[in-house]
């Protein structure tokens, strides 16, 4: 489909992609909805335009490019490493601006040198913006979900709580709500007394049989809902989560970590100092963080011009490590956002593990920034 009403800087953008030896790729506007609903995160899920095929398959208008580019890579069985670029329309329900707008970006798939690929993504994003909005002061913010995951794991929380906190990473309001619940647990209410008795005695088989008989008596079909075993295990997890309390020292450590905000050039020493003071072993996560900072320096990116915020994340569930955003100084409008998504291609059906990192440029916001 020919692209119309492109911004006047589109030619410069395409030239930048070509100079970085990317393969230009296009994907269908109509996409299967399931991958986005499963993997994209709540913020994007509620903005998707959904529809159905005549056979009842759930479809959507393309809400972003990362998942479609990855699906196309898997379907064409293309080898890696591979660098893709894209430029096209995406469709989202938004309170401000149009519902359809242009997005462009680069997806870097299969490079095993994680630090180098991360540095290239950040460096390319900054360099492209410097060409598109020349003379404008940029603000770059970087976070690392893998470091947050390492901190949560080192604190020894139950796996259910770890998953909840990691899922909320980047959403401070949601994180603060979860931390408040960890500080002051609330008992589970409304449970069937018989189910509660099985749970407190740890009798999973008895609980499953009780749930099964209840479902049969009330006409619930296991084909249309969760199985008795699934329900039993979710109830057990819910009870464990409700009884878990984060002690005062662990709570203080987690809050101290989330409050870290320093220039990236100082971040490695700040994180090492935090880990030593808290007695936490963050191992590989810190090693990868340090390697990325070094790779950024080797790529000529000034780490002193980038802010590291330990609590910073992006509202997409598929990120696994590096996350970053670029704005104009003094503005909250994100011009570029990106990060690492090492698990995504496997979840989408790739036979082999494919590390990946990329970023997207918001062309309508860049157009506004150019006019400012």
Curated annotation (Swiss-Prot):
GO molecular function: histidine-tRNA ligase activity
Pfam family, any one: tRNA-synt_His
Associated pathway: Amino-acid biosynthesis; L-histidine biosynthesis; L-histidine from 5-phospho-alpha-D-ribose 1-diphosphate: step 1/9
Gene3D superfamilies: Bira Bifunctional Protein, Domain 2
Residue pairs linked by disulfide bridges in the UniProt entry: none
HAMAP family: HisZ (MF_00125)
Protein name, per record: ATP phosphoribosyltransferase regulatory subunit
The species this protein was found in: Rhizobium rhizogenes (strain K84 / ATCC BAA-868)
């Amino acid at each position: 489909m020919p692209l119309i009403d492109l911004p006047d800087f589109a030619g410069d953008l395409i030239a930048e992609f070509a100079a970085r030896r990317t393969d230009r790729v296009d994907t269908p506007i109509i996409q299967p909805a399931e991958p986005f609903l499963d993997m994209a995160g709540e913020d994007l899920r509620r903005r998707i335009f959904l529809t159905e095929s005549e056979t009842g398959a759930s479809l959507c208008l393309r809400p972003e490019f990362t998942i479609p580019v990855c699906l196309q890579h898997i379907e064409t069985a293309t080898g890696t490493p591979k660098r893709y670029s894209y430029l096209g329309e995406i469709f989202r329900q938004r309170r401000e601006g149009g519902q359809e707008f242009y997005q462009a970006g680069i997806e870097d798939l299969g490079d095993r040198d994680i630090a180098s690929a991360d540095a290239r993504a950040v460096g390319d994003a900054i360099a492209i913006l410097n060409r598109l909005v020349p003379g404008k002061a940029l603000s770059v913010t970087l976070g690392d979900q893998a470091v947050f995951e390492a901190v949560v794991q080192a604190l020894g929380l139950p796996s259910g709580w770890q998953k909840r906190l990691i899922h909320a990473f980047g959403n401070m309001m949601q994180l603060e709500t979860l931390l408040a619940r960890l500080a002051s647990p609330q008992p589970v209410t409304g449970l069937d007394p018989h189910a509660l008795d099985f749970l407190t005695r740890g009798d999973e088989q008895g609980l499953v049989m009780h749930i099964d008989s209840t479902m049969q008596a009330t006409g619930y079909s296991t084909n249309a809902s969760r199985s008795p075993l699934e329900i039993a295990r979710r109830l057990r997890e819910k009870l464990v989560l409700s009884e878990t309390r984060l002690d005062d020292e662990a709570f203080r450590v987690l809050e101290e970590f989330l409050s870290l905000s320093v220039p990236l050039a100082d971040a490695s020493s700040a994180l090492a100092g935090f880990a030593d003071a808290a007695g936490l072993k963050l191992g590989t996560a810190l090693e990868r963080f340090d390697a990325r900072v070094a790779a950024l320096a080797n790529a000529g990116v000034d780490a002193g011009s980038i802010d590291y915020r330990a609590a910073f994340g992006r509202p997409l569930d598929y990120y696994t490590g590096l996350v970053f955003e670029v704005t104009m100084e003094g503005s909250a409008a994100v011009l570029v956002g990106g990060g690492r998504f090492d698990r995504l291609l496997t979840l989408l059906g790739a036979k082999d593990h494919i590390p990946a990192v990329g970023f997207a440029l918001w062309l309508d916001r860049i157009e506004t920034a150019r006019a400012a």
